[in-house]
Regions:
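Glycine-rich, acidic/polar active-site loops that bind/position phosphate-bearing ligands
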Residues: 1-236
Length: 236
């Protein structure tokens, strides 16, 4: 899309599960593990499974010139996330290639990758691809009115956004597990249960310098469609 210039910055939070050859999540070989709670950003062999694969992927992406800004163990055992930053359409290019590299690295370790938004039913978090974004005005001349107006614009086309944000997302966006219901749209400051989270840093910066986090995209979403929807909506 020609409107997507390097003025637009994107940070994708790609979540996924490492899987065994039988399709079960890594670390679930003896059946369902204890309830989630200790796994998020966890340490220790009883709390984490697959760190060496995640770190090999990080190293490979950095060597390829892809700007990963971090990785972390996620809420469920065997679930991971990495953050991929880029400017303009290159953000989607890099996210797409980073996924390819992830599958290749995982293959070398004899495991698979599952980017379905809800691979395990029950009281387990799904996998999303929260999309953080900003443009020049948001970073240098923001205001509470500006950020609220942007959220309202995205809310007006919520159905179109959901259509662009990946398949089977209804299984993840239930209103539970740090999500808003797929049927509803909301935004709020530091609200992990909202469709759009307004970072507390925006408030701390007196709204002059900030960004927004769209929490609706699924882990299997097409990053080009996400960018096209966000920029297309906010530049109308």
């Amino acid at each position: 899309a020609e409107v997507v210039t390097d003025e637009w910055w994107f940070g994708f939070e790609q979540e996924y599960f490492f899987t065994n050859p039988d399709g079960s999540p890594l670390g679930w070989e003896k059946g369902e593990p204890r309830p989630q709670g200790d796994y998020y950003c966890g340490v220790g062999a009883d709390n984490v499974s697959g760190r060496e694969i995640s770190e090999a992927h990080l190293d490979a992406c950095l060597a390829a010139g892809i700007h990963l800004t971090g990785t972390n163990a996620e809420v469920a055992l065997g679930q991971w996330e990495y953050q991929c930053f880029g400017k303009g359409i290159k953000a989607a290019d890099d996210l797409w290639v980073s996924r390819y590299i992830l599958y290749k690295i995982a293959e070398e370790f004899g495991v698979g990758v599952n980017i379905h938004p809800k691979p395990k039913t029950g009281d387990w978090n799904g996998s999303g691809m929260h999309t953080n974004f900003s443009n020049e005005e948001m970073r240098t001349n923001g205001s509470e009115e500006l950020f609220s107006a942007m959220c309202d614009k995205l809310g007006e086309v919520h159905a179109e956004g959901i259509a662009a944000y990946g398949s089977d997302n209804d299984q993840r966006l239930t209103g539970l597990h740090e999500t808003q219901s797929i049927e509803k749209f909301s935004y709020g400051i530091s609200d992990r249960g909202a469709s759009i989270r307004i970072p507390i840093a925006n408030v701390e910066n007196n709204w002059k310098n900030g960004y927004l986090e769209d929490r609706r995209p699924a882990s299997n979403a097409d990053p080009y469609k996400i960018i096209a929807h966000i920029v297309g909506t906010l530049t109308k």
